[in-house]
Amino acid sequence: MRNATSWSLYRRLLSYVRPYWKAFLAAVVGYAIYAASSTALAEMMKRLIDGIQNPDAAFRLMLPLFVIGMFAARGVGTFLGTYYMSDVARNVVHALRCEVFNHMLRLPGRFFDMHSSGHLLSRVTYHVEQVTGAATNAITIILREGLFVIGLVSYLLWTNWMLTLIFMAVTPLIGLVVNYTSKRFRRLSRRIQNSMGDVTHVASEALSGYRVVRTHGAEAYEKARFAEASDYNREQSMKVALTKAVSTPVIQLLVALSLAGLVWLAMSPALMASMTPGEFVAFITAASLMAKPVRQLTEVNSTIQKGLSASQELFGLLEQPPEVDEGSYVPARIDGRVRFEGVRFRYGEDQAEVLKGIDLDVPQGEMIAIVGRSGSGKSTLVSLMPRFYRPTEGRVLLDDVDIQEYALSPLRQRIALVSQQVTLFNTTIAANIAYGHPDADREAVESAARSAYAHEFIERLPNGYDTVVGDNGVMLSGGQRQRLAIARAIFKDAPLLVLDEATSALDTESERYIQQALERVCRGRTTFVIAHRLSTIERADRILVMEQGEIIESGTHGELLAQDGAYAALHQLQFQEAE
């Protein structure tokens, strides 16, 4: 979409208007009434001047009625145009915003790895609002003032076509100015939108990590980062303001020069003889009335280009390919047998392999613990099962069926994930436990909480299960948040459970509660546990030791200690640290 033309962007935006064509047509009719009634002001001046020279009783009666009718029609047209165009615009923006958000939910994990959340949020909020400006204010002005200009030009041609063509001689010059400023507005608008993403990103990081900022005394550093991002946005906005401030007076000057030449020519004896005083005044009035709509049409150009630039970014996002979901297999039930066959994986073609020929067979109901240094590929390995990523080579099988053959949603519904970075939503505890099931039975929610050893602390909260936990569970302790995450996994009742460093950042008491909860939730389920504390996985059926993307050791806790290899060294190191 980077090289998309203005017309192609307009055409795509208009496709969102199609479902609301009736309201759009009503708005066009309203603005046509407005333009016709406003143009009638020139005709009123003609009748007034000519009527003064030849007054009669009918003229005295008809002219006031003409004035009343003209302004009444103008009011009706303004109402119809403004209301129905706002209705169309807000519906278009709503549809576009929802489409962008819904598409984001379907994008693959690699996309989110390559884009900051601040820039993505900016597209849903700031970019869409720029389209709103183009879809409401800009289109309103284009239709209303554009039809007004068409009406005035038509009236001028009807009154004196020769003078009108002379008056229109400056149109090519105005077109050159508009063309230059349009390109500049689009370029600057793209920079402003990117800088707004930077502003959102810096603010989001600093505010969500305010504890780290304060404990490290980094307030001054974050202030400087934010000021730099905001100042760049200000600089680009001022360039837009400068372009707008120069272009509008230039266009007005061109119109004024044309109008001055028109008056000079119109006052020549030859033309004065061919026109009545009323026609002369009406012609000059119509030409003068054109200054305001032309000015508004040139000023709205910056808003249009901002909207086009924003829509270009949004359409580019919508063209990102969604997560691949070519599978169609939907099993009635899953036992939980997992097999990795020659699995290799790299995050990018120019990056080193993270997994190197993984072969692993896990029977139903077995608990597999995975240990190793940071960066050894543990989390990447378990991320392949819910298809957050696809293997570069090899395949992963669930119940002897390649997971690529499964329909994506049913596959993920049968996998429960609990990680160190718990995600809680700013809603009630009950809604967090039953996430994705708004009509869940309260007894089932409480049963899951009891199994996760969370019921006791929940009951002590002021509103119990109806307590709102705050942004990402800020009102709860780390252990409480972790127990809610486990309760969510228990409520899901999936046959396959993945625990990614679920207890690594907890105190001893919280870890004891969570260990008891995990022992309960793991029963009868195939479980993958990534652990930093080896004491938490001693009861695992099998322990895998990973190093640089390979499984270098496999066995029970006792077997691996007896081998006196990498696992024994890790165990000895942690034992010494504990002492």
From Swiss-Prot:
Intracellular or extracellular location(s): Cell inner membrane
Keyword Membrane: yes
Keyword terms, alphabetized: ATP-binding, Cell inner membrane, Cell membrane, Lipid transport, Membrane, Nucleotide-binding, Translocase, Transmembrane, Transmembrane helix, Transport
Main location: membrane
Any one GO MF annotation of this record: ATP binding
Domain ABC transmembrane type-1 stretches: 25-306
Cellular compartments per GO CC: plasma membrane
Keyword ATP-binding: yes
Enzymatic reactions: ATP + H2O + lipid A-core oligosaccharideSide 1 = ADP + phosphate + lipid A-core oligosaccharideSide 2
EC number: 7.5.2.6
Residues binding ATP, per UniProt: G372, R373, S374, G375, S376, G377, K378, S379
Gene3D superfamilies listed in its UniProt record: ABC transporter type 1, transmembrane domain, P-loop containing nucleotide triphosphate hydrolases
Residue ranges that the Swiss-Prot or TrEMBL entry lists as coiled coil: none
Entry note about domains: In MsbA the ATP-binding domain (NBD) and the transmembrane domain (TMD) are fused.
Quaternary context: Homodimer.
PANTHER family the record matches: ATP-BINDING CASSETTE SUB-FAMILY B MEMBER 10, MITOCHONDRIAL (PTHR43394:SF1), ATP-DEPENDENT PERMEASE MDL1, MITOCHONDRIAL (PTHR43394)
NCBIfam families named in the record: MsbA_lipidA (TIGR02203)
Protein name (Swiss-Prot/TrEMBL): ATP-dependent lipid A-core flippase
Organism of derivation: Chromohalobacter salexigens (strain ATCC BAA-138 / DSM 3043 / CIP 106854 / NCIMB 13768 / 1H11)
Name of the encoding gene: msbA
